UniProtKB/Swiss-Prot annotation:
Glycans are attached at residues 86, 102. Residues 42-123, 180, 234-236, 349-354, 408-411, 493-542 are extracellular. InterPro entries: MFS_dom, MFS_sugar_transport-like, MFS_trans_sf, Orgcat_transp/SVOP, Sugar_transporter_CS. The keyword Magnesium does not apply. The lineage of its organism: Eukaryota, Metazoa, Chordata, Craniata, Vertebrata. Belongs to the major facilitator (TC 2.A.1) superfamily. Organic cation transporter (TC 2.A.1.19) family. It comes from Macaca fascicularis. GO terms for molecular function: antiporter activity; organic anion transmembrane transporter activity; xenobiotic transmembrane transporter activity. It comes from the Eukaryota. GO terms for biological process: monoatomic ion transport; prostaglandin transport; response to toxic substance. Its main location: membrane. This is Organic anion transporter 3.
């Protein structure tokens, strides 16, 4: 008997499982708001220099730019006498008296004047937020192994609620950035624990469906954010609105049970048995739960216990040539996906289309993208799907370089297509990486992969700063990186209908150029298949 069969005995997909997935899914729905929040809280409105004291408005004060609109960062030097020389002979100066913003909505940009020479601080704030997700994954992943999944989940809810609320009351920009960093740490802890607890408590046959449902919670969250931002024009109130629900999630998380596998592996089998019996009673199978014994539970988790005792590190990912090649190619694919994804997801403002409508479109494209991904993974395979997703995304981003700014519709279509391809890439990578790495080192491999996508998402906003040198440079960098990631995926083996490797030595028996996938009995395939997890970019394993 396996743990899956024990799960069947206590209710399989009963009331507990549906409530469990719902409790885990609601925070994910709201987590998308935090992840993409700076699209609206850091929006940069049209602006120009504030007039000097006692100066009258007019073209003799604010010069006109090449586009026929007032310059955003320069003004004419105001003469001390009443005479006004010819515009072509006048010198210009920075906005010494601040700026005037043509918007009824406020943001961190308008409050702290993050424009002109200070506009780099806006991108830096997003990078520091992403750095929080990166550091949180490294620190909280280790703490989760030591103290359990549920305590980390509960503390992460509280951390995100408190730091998000703190950001809403930040008196200065540096304080705001610190709180956003802590928000990133909280998001990482929520992601890590949610994925593990969702997969563990759902039977094998339902994991793909429930994982898909949980993934779509993130997608739905992308629809909610524009509505909230439109209804709440003040960035502080918007920040507070998306943070307060996590205080409620903090309280509800006390109902969430701990990972049974973690309890058994850490010598807390008695507590694990009590939880299983509680779940059985909740599902109307109290008698089945009472018949479970400690010896039976330990016996059926003996394999997990044995694997846990075998300690592997990131260095083992480079032990044999095939594993080294896989790790390099997967790392590049993960980096490219995170790097390019956030170039589009956080660049909604650049396409000259209504910010709220475009964000809804950007969120909506994930729905068909993930559905097409599921079909492609099942019929074309992981290798083809992964390579195609990144290559097409890279091509779309590079094409943006050659489309004039006035062709807004064409640029928007390319951006939406590219974002859909990158969403597809994320969905594929979660499954593909899990299938490629052997069981004994799978968690380590997923952790390293997650690290690289966080590095990519952290560097992505900083690359936008290169646009001040030449506007086309960022898209060139994003596009080429995506193409490199897609090219790297071409060197990975196909895993469709292949048995999952248990040990590192099993990889040495794999043929890199196997043309015909081995057909297996459906029952055997179901027991080996790792479910597709078409989550958002921040719902991966760590």
């Amino acid at each position: 008997m396996t743990f899956s069969e024990i799960l069947d005995r206590v209710g399989s997909m009963g009331r507990f499982q549906f409530l469990h997935v719902a409790i885990l899914g609601l925070p994910i729905l709201n987590m998308a708001n935090h992840n993409l929040l700076q699209i609206f809280t850091a929006a940069t409105p049209v602006h120009h220099c504030r007039l000097p004291p006692n100066a009258s408005a007019g073209p003799w004060v604010i010069p006109m730019g090449p586009n026929g609109k007032p310059e955003r960062c320069l003004r004419f030097v105001h003469p001390s006498n009443a005479s006004l020389p010819n515009d072509t002979q006048r010198s210009m100066e920075p906005c010494l008296d601040g700026w005037v913003y043509n918007s009824t909505k406020d943001s961190i940009v308008t409050e702290w004047n993050l424009v002109c020479n200070s506009n780099k601080l806006k991108e830096m704030a997003q990078s520091i937020f992403m750095a929080g997700i990166l550091i949180g994954g490294l620190v909280l992943g280790d703490l989760s192994d030591r103290f359990g999944r549920r305590p980390i989940l509960t503390c992460s809810y509280l951390l995100l609620a408190a730091s998000g609320s703190g950001a809403a009351f930040s008196p200065t920009f540096p304080v705001y950035v610190v709180f956003r960093f802590l928000c990133g740490c909280g998001i990482s802890g929520i992601t890590l624990s949610t994925v593990i607890l969702n997969v563990e408590w759902v039977p094998t046959r339902m994991r793909a469906i429930m994982s898909t449902a949980l993934g779509y919670c993130y997608t739905v969250g992308q629809f909610i954010l524009p509505g909230l931002a439109y209804a709440i024009p003040q960035w502080r109130w918007l920040q507070l609105t998306v943070s307060i629900p996590f205080f409620i999630f903090f309280l509800s998380s006390w109902w969430t049970p701990e990972s049974i596998r973690w309890l058994v592996l850490t010598g807390k089998s008695s507590k694990a048995l009590k939880i299983l019996r509680r779940v059985a009673a909740f599902n109307g199978k109290k008698e089945e739960g009472e018949r479970l014994s400690l010896e039976e539970l330990k016996l059926n988790l003996q394999k997990e216990i044995s694997l846990a005792k075998a300690k592997y590190t990131a260095a083992d990912l480079f032990r044999i040539p095939m594993l080294r090649r896989m790790t390099f190619c997967l790392s590049l694919a993960w980096f490219a996906t995170g790097f390019a994804y956030y170039s589009l997801a956080m660049g909604v403002e650049e396409f000259g289309v209504n910010l709220y409508i475009l964000q809804i479109i950007f969120g909506g494209v994930d729905i068909p993208a993930k559905f097409i991904t599921i079909l492609s993974l099942s019929y074309l395979g992981r290798h083809t799907t992964q390579a195609a997703a990144l290559l097409l995304a890279g091509g779309a981003i590079l094409a943006l370089t050659f489309v004039p700014l006035d062709l807004q519709t064409v640029r928007t279509v390319l951006a939406v297509f590219g974002k859909g391809c990158l969403s597809s890439s994320f969905s594929c990578l979660f499954l593909y990486t899990s299938e490629l790495y052997p069981t004994v080192i799978r968690q380590t491999g997923m952790g390293v992969s997650n690290l690289w996508t966080r590095v990519g998402s952290m560097l992505s906003p900083l690359v936008k700063i290169t646009g001040e040198v030449q506007p086309f440079i960022p898209n060139i960098i994003y596009g080429i990186t995506a193409l490199l990631g897609g090219s790297a995926a071409l060197f990975l083996p196909e895993t469709l209908n292949q048995p999952l490797p248990e040990t590192i030595e099993d990889l040495e028996n794999w043929s890199l150029r196997a043309k015909e996938p081995k057909q297996e009995p459906e029952v055997e395939k179901a027991s080996q298949r790792i479910p597709l997890q078409p989550y958002g970019p921040d719902l991966g394993s760590s």
